[in-house]
């Protein structure tokens, strides 16, 4: 086991504080509409330019082990806020730095760290309660656009695209962000359920111009296994032919005589049919087939259920208003499933999202949820260079999470003003001793930090701005850093989601509380590099 270094008391806190400052100072320059960019060196390719706090935080690794511990703890604040709210990472970092700085001073002056932490926790609870009480619900489309614009650093085009996407796919719908092949940013909305499997044979195509299959009001046969035996498939094909409707077959695979017969029937005009492979793999495939069955009001034919293909009747097949099958995608529009069953399935998937610990599983579950609940919107981000596209994509991601959060819990005045106004809630907090009271004062000072930083990044004097804001008592009155004007921030469209502000404060206080109460630090001793042996003298034998 390698030897360890141990640091105690003030020395430990000083080292940790230095690490916190290095990381926070690099992150906080990005805060606000006039925040600056940070350039990140990449071991390959062009450097990356970003204004996203969590991206900057994740790049920082310090040489000194003890300083690095402090930096990594604050990086955890940014990551946690990003995971929960998707935005507000820079605000969380600024708040954490402010609480840690004030807390370390108090501990150095002889106060009890545990009481300070209790005071900080009480203060945060009171402020969060005040924020929730003053929240406004977001209902109008232009309010959603404003939230997106603010989070995308004043880019109105991004705000508009996000509002349009949310209007079309609903709050549960999936909005994905991709890099465009052109310089133009565009929005594409896929209504209904789409999965990434295309037709098994080009002979199924009904629209040769667009090379796709279009089936109006088809039956949908959902089968879990491979279909190769024609005899098992004949009874259901005959029933569909008699009904005069088209048929979509979704199965693990369709091959051999079964595929040949379907193609021949289609070409002779006897039956309008298309076959596609089932989406996903393993257990996920089973779940997705069940989703399609619920959406179309059919039954997923599976041996687990004891249903044989030859016994399938028309009422076991799903129905849809329209199905479009392209080379690589299948879209089912307006499935005939019952609303209550779809809602039940949505609730079930939501519960699984809450329980899962895997990010990959969560992402896949959210995709399934969106396909059932609304649809999928794709924002393709364009730009002149690869560096510009990546920077813009970061901002679109932030803005997308912020708009979702705004719809969920409502909005507050932006620019750090909501936290400043929530200070009055601290006067009502009861404490048991002077050290807890000091913990509350730490939070009182710390929640000014975002306003000060936004002002300083915009070239103004932070303390003057804070002083002017304190003169007025209206909750929405604040300073717009973009226009350098004072006024009602709700009217000016400078708004932040409650969830983002709340999460930033709670996560910052949580990690800062741990740092304040740290009394010892243990790290591995740096290994001394062995000196390189000298080169032997060159030979003289020539």
UniProtKB/Swiss-Prot annotation:
Reactions performed catalytically: ATP + H2O + a folded polypeptide = ADP + phosphate + an unfolded polypeptide
Documented EC number(s): 5.6.1.7
Taxonomy, superkingdom: Bacteria
Top EC class, one word: isomerase
Keywords assigned by UniProt, alphabetized: ATP-binding, Chaperone, Cytoplasm, Isomerase, Nucleotide-binding, Plasmid
Keyword ATP-binding: yes
GO cellular component: cytoplasm
One Pfam family here: Cpn60_TCP1
Sites where the protein binds ATP: 30-33, 51, 87-91, 415, 496
Cellular compartments annotated: Cytoplasm
GO annotation terms (biological process): protein refolding
NCBIfam families, alphabetized: GroEL, PRK00013.1, PRK12849.1, PRK12850.1, PRK12851.1
Role summary: Together with its co-chaperonin GroES, plays an essential role in assisting protein folding. The GroEL-GroES system forms a nano-cage that allows encapsulation of the non-native substrate proteins and provides a physical environment optimized to promote and accelerate protein folding.
Subunit structure: Forms a cylinder of 14 subunits composed of two heptameric rings stacked back-to-back. Interacts with the co-chaperonin GroES.
Name of this protein: Chaperonin GroEL 2
Lineage: Bacteria, Pseudomonadati, Pseudomonadota, Alphaproteobacteria, Hyphomicrobiales
């Amino acid at each position: 086991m390698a030897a360890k270094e141990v640091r105690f008391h003030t020395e430990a806190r000083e080292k940790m504080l230095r690490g916190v400052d290095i990381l926070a100072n690099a992150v906080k320059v990005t805060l606000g509409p006039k925040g600056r960019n940070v350039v990140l060196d990449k071991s390959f390719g062009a450097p990356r330019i970003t204004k996203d706090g969590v991206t900057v935080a994740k790049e920082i690794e310090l040489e000194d082990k003890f300083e690095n511990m402090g930096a990594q703890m604050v990086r955890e604040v940014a990551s946690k806020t990003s995971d929960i709210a998707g935005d507000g990472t820079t605000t969380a970092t600024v708040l954490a730095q402010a609480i840690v700085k004030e807390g370390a001073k108090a501990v150095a002056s002889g106060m009890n760290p545990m009481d300070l932490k209790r005071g900080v926790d009480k203060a945060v609870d009171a402020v969060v309660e005040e924020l929730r009480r003053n929240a406004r619900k977001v209902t109008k489309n232009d309010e959603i656009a404003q939230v997106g614009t603010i989070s995308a650093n004043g880019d109105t085009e991004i705000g508009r695209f996000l509002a349009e996407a949310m209007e079309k796919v609903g709050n549960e719908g999936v909005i994905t962000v991709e890099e465009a092949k052109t310089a133009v940013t565009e929005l594409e909305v896929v209504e209904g359920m789409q999965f990434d499997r295309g037709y098994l044979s080009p002979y199924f195509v009904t629209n040769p111009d667009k090379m796709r299959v279009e089936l109006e009001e088809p039956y949908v046969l959902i089968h879990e296994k491979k279909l190769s035996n024609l005899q098992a498939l004949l009874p259901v094909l005959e029933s569909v032919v008699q009904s005069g409707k088209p048929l979509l077959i979704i199965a693990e695979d369709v091959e051999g005589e079964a595929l040949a017969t379907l193609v021949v029937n289609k070409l002779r005009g006897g039956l309008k049919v298309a076959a596609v492979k089932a989406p996903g793999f393993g257990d996920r495939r089973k779940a997705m087939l069940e989703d399609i069955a619920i959406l179309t009001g059919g039954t997923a034919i599976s041996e687990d259920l004891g249903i044989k293909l030859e016994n399938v009747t028309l009422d076991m097949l799903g129905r849809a208003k329209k199905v479009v099958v392209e080379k690589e995608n299948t879209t089912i529009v307006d499935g005939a499933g019952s609303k209550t069953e779809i809602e039940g399935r949505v609730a079930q998937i939501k519960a699984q999202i809450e329980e899962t610990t895997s990010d990959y599983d969560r992402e896949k579950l959210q995709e399934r949820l969106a396909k059932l609940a609304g649809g999928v919107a794709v924002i393709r981000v364009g730009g002149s260079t690869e560096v510009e596209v990546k920077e813009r994509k970061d901002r679109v991601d932030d803005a997308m999470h912020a708009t979702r959060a705004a719809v969920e819990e409502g909005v507050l005045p932006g620019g750090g003003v909501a936290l400043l106004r929530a200070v009055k809630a601290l006067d009502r907090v009861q404490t048991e001793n002077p050290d807890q009271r000091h913990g509350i004062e730490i939070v009182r000072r710390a929640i000014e930090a975002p306003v000060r930083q936004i002002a300083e990044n915009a070239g103004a004097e932070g303390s003057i701005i804070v002083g002017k804001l304190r003169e007025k008592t209206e909750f929405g009155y604040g300073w717009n850093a973009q226009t350098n004007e004072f006024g009602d921030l709700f009217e000016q469209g400078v708004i932040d989601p409650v969830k983002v502000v709340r999460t930033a404060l709670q996560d910052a206080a949580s990690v800062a509380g741990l740092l304040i109460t740290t009394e010892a630090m243990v790290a591995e001793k740096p290994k001394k590099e062995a000196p390189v042996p000298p080169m032997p003298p060159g030979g003289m034998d020539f």
